[in-house]
Amino acid sequence: VRRVWADGRELDLTTLVVRVHRGDETQPPDPLIVAKEGADNAPAYRGLAYVVFERLPLESFGNRVPQFSFEVARPVDGLAAMIRAVCLIPGASEFGHETSPVMQAFGFGVTRPENRHQLTAAADVVASLDALQALCPNLRRVSLVVSWFGDDLRAGHCTVAPRVESAVKVTQGAEWSAAGLTRASARIVSQAGGAAAYGGTPSDASVVRLIRHLKDRGLEVVLYPFVMMDVAGDNAMPDPWTGAPGQPAYPWRGRITCDPAPGRVGTVDASAAAATQIEAFFGTAAAGDFAVASGAVSYSGPAEWSFRRHILHYAHLVQAAGGVDGFIIGSELVGLTRVRSAAGIYPAVAQLCTLAADLRAVLGPATKIAYAADWTEYGAHVRDGGAEVRFPLDPLWSHAAIDAVGIDFYPPIADWRDGADHADLAEARSPHDLDYLRARVAGGEAFDWYYASEADRQAQTRTPIADGAYAKPWVFRAKDLVGWWSSPHIERVGGLETATTAWSPRAKPIWLTEIGVPAVDKGANGPNVFPDPKSSESAIPPFSGGSRDDLIQSAPSKRSCPVSTPCWRAIRPAQTRSRLFTARR
């Protein structure tokens, strides 16, 4: 039971004593009825669900028992029972992580809730977690996303720092503070469409309280520090990828890179200048520059807002919260991890290795540490038409401080089109067909074949993925996690295999740190895209009409469809073919 109405008006359940008896065959009588009527006269109503209101103020209803209406929810077979881990977002919300109510005050007794927009719990995050655990009975872990903001796609110029929605906001219940900044001293997120482009960085105190709250619920906590790019559409900063003035609006963090970017004329890739730019992005903040006292983190290091300061701040903040089960040291920085300082040398990866070692010293041996690579980033870096093959992240994956290979896994699963003449009709009659989707988790695009151009995609002209030189096609298959995980990694130069990397086959589990399919028409064609009018990244899946499609994402009732949760039921068998996966759905 979630929401309750009395005479058509929703009740604030936080102001009432309400007990729900779920109707199982062993439920005892309600203690209030026993106290009033005696044990011999208080039925347990076993097999019948009922609700007891204790001391309901009947004067509010004309001194009579009102007519009640109840919202009742229960999990159904399929997706809900499969989910064992979730990412808790948004990571950009000043008080969205706060477990007690916070009000914005406007003067003269006028207030507005910052984090309570329902009547079932003290704060929205508490109500959401109540519903989540009720509907996902096997939930074990929560990946808690917390965001700072980057401001430039040029690595040598990009700062990473907390931001707020407004410099002038009076709040009751909690005040905003993060990394030693107050509302008055923090930078403000940019405006888009007359409103803040993002919510602000979560207040440090709210993160501490939410970590403790999650652990009190019996959930394991993985902290996921996240970089959002606050680059407004009217900026004049040079784009490292094109050289043109004005960087794309609100881009993906994976586009942060050296300037000029790899592939451009005059690029600094494969030079010492690239390493210098990477060093500027990571910064020099050290673990010893932070201290924890009274539940807060202080900093006494260099005056920089850098990636290292971002990650090390949260490493110390989780210590203030009593620790966490897992920690993500960064995610989807593919534009950085593919930059070279010389042939085969990747300075951002070396920086991540150093950071991982620093985090291990701060977090101790009990906390699992991982980097969450983009699904296009975790494996081989292929250059010169396949003549050069490197494995940039292998030093990180094999590092003693890293416990798992994290992958944000959003590859195309389907290639469905409208009409009666597209190629996939030979495999299935519907984009929701379970066998079709299951075959495409480790098959189809990015496994068996690829599109060499957009024109090829439109025409469905598919180029097979093969390795004529060494018969190791997994090297070029972004979706072949099993092949990558279970094989030695041998680099190639000039088309010839050279040295084996430090990776040991099957040495560490893979965490699917993010995974999902949007509830949109043909969502499985492009799980990695989403509409966002303010962002240059805004998109819908290829060949999608943009209409809603819940079936491709979540489970319908068995009555309406015997095959539930197409994408996730397909992914599950593919994972269990080997021991490489730690379940983090």
What are these regions (language model features)?
Residues V1-H97, T111-E114:
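Polar, S/T/G-rich
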Residues Q118-L129, G200-V208, E304-H313, Y346-A357, ...:
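Well-ordered, non-membrane alpha-helical segments in soluble/globular domains
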Residues K522-R585:
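Aromatic-rich peripheral "rim/lid" segments of glycoside hydrolase catalytic domains that contact
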Residues D7, I89, A131-L135, V145, ...:
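Structured segments of extracytoplasmic/periplasmic soluble domains
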Residues R84-F106, R140-G344, K368, D374-W375:
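Substrate-binding cleft and catalytic face of glycoside hydrolase catalytic domains
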Residues R74-L79, V126-R140, V207-R217, L312-A321, ...:
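Short amphipathic alpha-helices and their capping/turn segments at secondary-structure boundaries
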Residues V1, G109-P137, S190-V207, R308-R309, ...:
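Short linear interaction motifs
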Residues E279, G283-P531:
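Noncatalytic carbohydrate-binding groove/subsite architecture in carbohydrate-active enzymes
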